[in-house]
A protein has these predicted regions:
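Short, glycine-/Ser/Thr-/acidic-enriched flexible segments
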Residues: 21-22, 36, 158, 191, ...
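Conserved acidic residues
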Residues: 149, 227-228
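Conserved small/polar residues in nucleotide/adenosyl-binding loops
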Residues: 233-235
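Feature captures the catalytic cores and cofactor-binding loops of soluble hydro-lyases/lyases
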Residues: 219
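Active-site charged/polar residues at nucleotide-handling catalytic sites that mediate phosphoryl
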Residues: 224
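N-terminal active-site beta-alpha-beta segment that forms phosphate/nucleotide-binding
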Residues: 45-212
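Positively charged, low-complexity intrinsically disordered leader regions
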Residues: 1-35, 39
Length: 235
């Protein structure tokens, strides 16, 4: 299965899904440098807190390709940190990478950086998978009856916002994969229309869904036909 970010085999480079082209075009961008990684975060080619953190971790690994001294490492971390100052996962990932790399001699840092970035990515996948397992039980416990499970979601909290599986959408995928009859109401999420990314994801997975205007969400909830509402952009 495709992830949102992955290292290029046999090369010191990383491929990402260019999310600015979705849902109309599927494209992959190759990152060769820390500047490429910073631009990908800044331009929202990658988005979602978990994915931003993983991209930053790989950005530090890319930064050490030619020089792995302290100045290069710290300058790269500052560049990446400035791309999204409020992104918690970004700063967490950079701090973890620096904690792992700074005690090492420069000669050992490149391989260690790629290894740690891969570990952070794999940990995110596992965490999201477990969110799906746990969240599915909550969805089933709160369903209104034996009919179709009706879910409403806002913004995008699926695998495009992480490395795989997603956060709030992970239980939806877990339900569908378990053969549960499920339908998702996707709010468009103005002004950036992240709901279209959610709809694209769901279509790739085969999950039945309907995109609705943000203003229609309240009506659907008021009618009492929604089992659960997941995902938030602003609270």
């Amino acid at each position: 299965p495709l992830r949102t970010i992955w290292p290029v085999a046999g090369a010191r480079a990383v491929d990402i899904i260019d999310q600015t082209a979705l849902p109309h075009t599927f494209g992959v961008r190759r990152l060769h440098s820390v500047e490429d990684a910073a631009q990908a975060i800044r331009s929202m080619q990658v988005r979602g807190a978990p994915l931003i953190g993983v991209t930053a971790a790989h950005g530090l690994a890319l930064a050490l390709a030619s020089r792995a001294d302290d100045d290069t490492l710290l300058a790269a971390a500052r560049l990446l940190a400035a791309t999204r100052p409020t992104a918690v996962n970004l700063h967490w990932a950079l701090a973890r990478m620096q904690s792992r790399l700074l005690p090492l001699p420069p000669a050992a840092r490149v391989d260690a950086a790629w290894s740690e970035a891969a570990t952070i990515a794999d940990e995110d996948v596992d965490q999201c998978r477990r969110i799906g397992i746990h969240g599915l039980q909550l969805l089933l416990a709160g369903r209104r009856g034996e009919g179709r499970l009706e879910i409403m979601t806002h913004c995008n909290a699926g695998w495009l916002a992480t490395v795989d599986h997603g956060t709030a959408l992970a239980p939806v995928y877990a339900a569908f994969d378990a053969g549960i009859d499920i339908h998702v109401w996707v709010s468009e999420t103005r002004p950036r229309n992240q709901g279209l990314l959610t709809a694209w994801e769901l279509r790739q997975h085969g999950v039945p869904h309907t995109v609705v205007a943000d203003n229609a969400a309240g009506l659907l909830l008021a009618r009492g036909g929604i089992d659960a509402e997941i995902g938030r952009a602003h609270v």
